[in-house]
Amino acid sequence: MAIRRICELPEPVLRKKAKKVPSIDGSIQTLIDDMIETMNSADGAGLAAPQVGVSLRLVVFREPDTKEATVLINPEIIKKEGQRQVTEGCLSIPGYFGELTRAETVTAKGLDRHGKACRIKGTGIVAQLLEHETEHLDGILYIDHLESEDQLHEIGPDDEMPEEIRE
């Protein structure tokens, strides 16, 4: 396992639509392990493959209750319900966080790291992680949802970003 460099804006890979993972082989398993290690090292809540420079449809995130990493390969959001105001940050946009609207409940499907079909229904922070990380795969960042510059805030040198918004 290795800690990979996290890409930051304006790196082009963050704005590209990622390609489907064609097969789950040893290189994908290594990528998954590296992404989990990178996410944990950066104290992030989630990470998408484009954030480590790999344009593939693969995300990892940590569920707050268990801190275990969840892996979704070729994820697709199939249902969104409700709305809630959230505060959100991103490892690829360091030093900032924004206030935006996300779904209260999100259902996604994809494959786990072993290629088995899975479905995840998340509420609250898990729904937020599913939306945020899956959007990375289409080149969409949370800042694209901000309605005004007033919703984007800079983190001062003595400020610490709350854990729930480190994505």
From Swiss-Prot:
Cofactor comment text: Binds 1 Fe(2+) ion.
Q: Which InterPro entries match?
A: Peptide_deformylase, Peptide_deformylase_sf
Transmembrane portions of the chain: none
Q: Tell me, what is an example of a GO biological process annotation in this record?
A: co-translational protein modification
Give UniProt keywords alphabetically: Hydrolase, Iron, Metal-binding, Protein biosynthesis
Positions binding Fe cation in this chain are C90, H132, H136
Q: Which cofactor does it need?
A: Fe(2+)
What SUPFAM superfamilies does its record include? Answer: Peptide deformylase
Q: Which residues form a coiled coil?
A: none
Q: Which residues carry out catalysis?
A: E133
Give the NCBIfam families listed for this entry.
pept_deformyl, PRK00150.1-3
Alphabetical list of PANTHER family matching this protein? PEPTIDE DEFORMYLASE
Q: Which family does it belong to?
A: Belongs to the polypeptide deformylase family.
Q: What is this protein called?
A: Peptide deformylase
